[in-house]
């Protein structure tokens, strides 16, 4: 299935003062040198033009819709306009532009759910800036889950995956303090995270029989209870349940021996118990080409595995590889899924 048959990837602008505009321009400008799926930038065309001028780039920009984006992509950077209400200064975020950030997300999600765009890719946002403007969600992912639930009437449990050429890793708990992880690791949360991950690996990643390796929480996976009870009392019963339901699952495994080359050959995804247990190996093995994928949503969502990098904005030094990887993976998952919805 070609990109023309499934529509462009809808790419949100992210925080306009960050590097989102810079890396978007770089990806498009280098499209002739490497495979780049057609995308539709949902954001401020004037911002893109100003950033291109600041960076010394000549980038033609055209305002268009989804079908027009695919047709125009080789000649111009297609934009679905969402205007920023306040002037944008690279590196200086302004809460006055928070409404444009969320409007771009809302618009892109609507386009994907309507089947006009094939998938969603999101440039980085600043939670601190959005909080200043009254944003009430813990982060980007939770906001997307709320939009999906309101659109479909079905609550979604979003699951975070870092996907790179050498490793896919999923943290069960995400942005919580390490001291709170043991209490947050409930059997239901571990089970749902694993089943959602397996379902998306089948339907979107083209893996009919995914292999899951589940990490323990404690050193040496608890060492029979000597170093903690969670591995045997909480994690192991979930693994037994998953196996009984036919999933290919191993664990709980000591995390310090899960990520070397030979170990990674034995599984398709590592299910980790907390944020750094998953993201440290994922980023160490593929910092520039790892992609943040949100599983469990009724649409495909990817993003680069970095933040707004305000200190780099407008300087021509931000690297675009992770965004390109996010766009490529979004298009690949859409082709695998045969459309946009679960």
Curated annotation (Swiss-Prot):
Gene3D superfamilies named in the record: Isopropylmalate Dehydrogenase
Binding residue positions for a divalent metal cation: 175, 220, 275
Compartments, record wording: Cytoplasm
InterPro entries named among the record's database cross-references: PdxA (IPR037510), PdxA_fam (IPR005255)
Biological pathway: Cofactor biosynthesis; pyridoxine 5'-phosphate biosynthesis; pyridoxine 5'-phosphate from D-erythrose 4-phosphate: step 4/5
UniProt KW NAD keyword: yes
Cofactor(s) recorded in Swiss-Prot or TrEMBL: Zn(2+); Mg(2+); Co(2+)
SUPFAM superfamilies associated with the record: Isocitrate/Isopropylmalate dehydrogenase-like
Gene Ontology terms: cellular component: cytoplasm
EC class name: oxidoreductase
Metal-binding is among the record's keywords: yes
Catalytic activity: 4-(phosphooxy)-L-threonine + NAD(+) = 3-amino-2-oxopropyl phosphate + CO2 + NADH
Residues given in the record as substrate binding sites: 140-141, 283, 292, 301
Enzyme Commission numbers on file: 1.1.1.262
UniProt record, GO biological process: pyridoxal phosphate biosynthetic process; pyridoxine biosynthetic process
Cofactor note: Binds 1 divalent metal cation per subunit. Can use ions such as Zn(2+), Mg(2+) or Co(2+).
A Pfam family matched in the record: PdxA
GO terms of molecular function: 4-hydroxythreonine-4-phosphate dehydrogenase activity; cobalt ion binding; magnesium ion binding; NAD binding; zinc ion binding
Its biological purpose: Catalyzes the NAD(P)-dependent oxidation of 4-(phosphooxy)-L-threonine (HTP) into 2-amino-3-oxo-4-(phosphooxy)butyric acid which spontaneously decarboxylates to form 3-amino-2-oxopropyl phosphate (AHAP).
Note: The active site is located at the dimer interface.
Assembly notes: Homodimer.
UniProt family annotation: Belongs to the PdxA family.
Name the record gives this protein: 4-hydroxythreonine-4-phosphate dehydrogenase
Organism: Rhizobium meliloti (strain 1021)
